[in-house]
Curated annotation (Swiss-Prot):
Annotated protein name in UniProt: Dihydroorotate dehydrogenase (quinone)
Binding site for substrate: K66, N111, R112, M113, G114, F115, N172, N177, N246, T247
Cofactor binding remark: Binds 1 FMN per subunit.
Catalytic activity: (S)-dihydroorotate + a quinone = orotate + a quinol
Gene behind this protein: pyrD
Keyword set includes Magnesium: no
Length: 336
C-alpha cells in the first residue's frame, strides 16, 4: 500500500529522472532509520545453483543498479542476490535522452539506455565496499565504440577486473541497444567468445584460487534453431549458467499503446510469456547440464513459479519491481 502511494508520485516524473532519484535515495537512506520504508526481514529459502549458495532464489536483474551503488539497500529488501551492471571497460554516457519509457497500461518498460555506466573500475570499488551477505553477480558488456570483431577483448578485460569480487559473472550479448551486439549470439562469433571466456576463467581460477561461474544472458527474439545452437555451444564450452531472457524488440503485445513505437528493448509483463517459452525450451535442450536463471515479466509469485516450473532454478525481477515495489520480493520469497 505504501509503495502504491509513493508510485503515484514517482510516475509523474520522467522515467529516467525517477530512476536516478530512487538510486540517490537508496544511497542516502541505507543504514539510517529511513530504510524502514524498504527493509524486509524475509525467511531464508536457501538454494545452491552453479556451486553457489543463495539465501533465496529471487534476485535483482542487471540494469537497475548499473554502477553497484545500492547493493546494500537492495539486500535490505530481501533479494537473495543482486546483479549489478551492465558495466563496460571504459565509462560511457549511453544513448541520447529520452531513452527510458513506461508503458503503464501494459506494465512494461522500453529502454534504449545503451550501457550507460561509470566503467568497470568504478563498479569494482563499489562492490568492494558493499556490506552485503548475499551473492553479487556482475554483468559485463562491451563499449559502444569497440568494433564488434574486437568485442571479445572488452569482455575479457571486464572479466579479469571483476573476477575476484564477483559471486558470478553474467555476459551480456543480448542487449538490443548496442549496435551489432546480438550478432555475438550466433555461430562462430559465439563459439569464439565462449572458448576465450572459458580460457580466461581457468587462468583466473588458478591465479586467485577461486572458481567464479560464468552465465550467458540471451535474448527472447531467437528462432528455435538459434536456441538449439546456443544450447549446444553452452554445453560444449561448459558454461556455468544461462540467463533467459533480456528485453524484446517485438511490439505485438503493446500495439497502439503510448510509447509502443519507441526504439529499444521492451521488458515487463509483455515479455512474460515469451521469456517463459524460452526457459522451457532451453530446459529441454540443456537438461541438467547447466542451470537457467529466469527473467522477464516476473511481477508476482505466480509468474515466478511459472518460470521455475518451466525449468528456472533462480529468478530475477526488474520491471515488475518498478511497478510493484519491494513487496514483490516478499511475495515471491514467502510463497516460492
Amino acid at each position: 500500500m505504501l509503495y502504491r502511494i509513493a508510485r503515484a508520485g514517482i510516475f509523474k516524473l520522467d522515467a529516467e529522472k525517477a530512476h536516478d532519484l530512487a538510486i540517490q535515495n537508496f544511497k542516502r537512506f541505507n543504514g539510517t532509520p529511513l530504510d524502514i520504508f524498504y527493509r524486509q526481514n524475509l525467511a531464508s529459502k536457501p538454494v545452491e545453483v552453479m556451486g553457489i549458495k543463495f539465501k533465496n532464489p529471487v534476485g535483482l536483474a542487471a540494469g537497475l543498479d548499473k554502477n553497484g551503488e545500492c547493493i546494500e539497500a537492495f539486500g535490505a529488501m530481501g533479494f537473495g542476490f543482486v546483479e549489478v551492471g551492465t558495466v563496460t571497460p571504459r565509462p560511457q554516457s549511453g544513448n541520447d535522452k529520452p531513452r527510458l519509457f513506461r508503458l503503464i497500461e501494459a506494465e512494461g518498460i522500453i529502454n534504449r539506455m545503451g550501457f550507460n555506466n561509470l566503467g568497470v573500475d568504478n563498479l569494482v570499488e563499489n562492490v568492494k565496499k558493499a556490506k552485503y551477505d548475499g551473492v553479487i553477480g556482475i554483468n559485463i558488456g562491451k563499449n559502444k565504440d569497440t568494433p564488434i570483431e574486437k568485442g571479445t577483448e572488452d569482455y575479457l578485460i571486464c572479466m579479469e577486473k571483476v573476477y575476484q569480487y564477483a559471486g558470478y559473472i553474467a555476459v551480456n550479448i543480448s542487449s538490443p541497444n548496442t549496435p551489432g551486439l546480438r550478432t555475438l549470439q550466433y555461430g562462430e562469433a559465439l563459439d569464439d567468445l565462449l572458448s576465450q571466456l572459458k580460457e580466461k576463467q581457468k587462468e583466473l581460477a588458478e591465479k586467485y584460487g577461486k572458481y567464479v561461474p560464468v552465465a550467458l544472458k540471451i535474448a527472447p527474439d531467437l528462432e528455435d534453431d538459434e536456441l538449439t545452437q546456443i544450447a549446444e555451444s553452452l554445453i560444449k564450452y561448459k558454461i556455468d549458467g544461462v540467463i533467459a531472457t533480456n528485453t524484446t524488440l517485438d511490439r505485438s503485445m503493446v500495439e497502439g499503446m503510448k510509447h509502443a513505437e519507441e526504439m529499444g528493448g521492451l521488458s515487463g509483463r509483455p515479455v512474460q510469456t515469451r521469456s517463459t517459452e524460452v526457459v522451457r525450451r532451453l530446459k529441454e535442450l540443456l537438461g541438467d547440464n547447466l542451470p537457467i536463471i529466469g527473467v522477464g515479466g516476473i511481477d508476482s509469485y505466480v509468474a515466478a513459479k511459472e518460470k521455475m516450473v518451466a525449468g528456472a532454478e533462480l529468478v530475477q525481477v526488474y520491471s515488475g519491481f518498478i511497478y510493484k515495489g519491494p513487496g514483490l520480493v516478499r511475495d515471491i520469497v514467502n510463497n516460492i
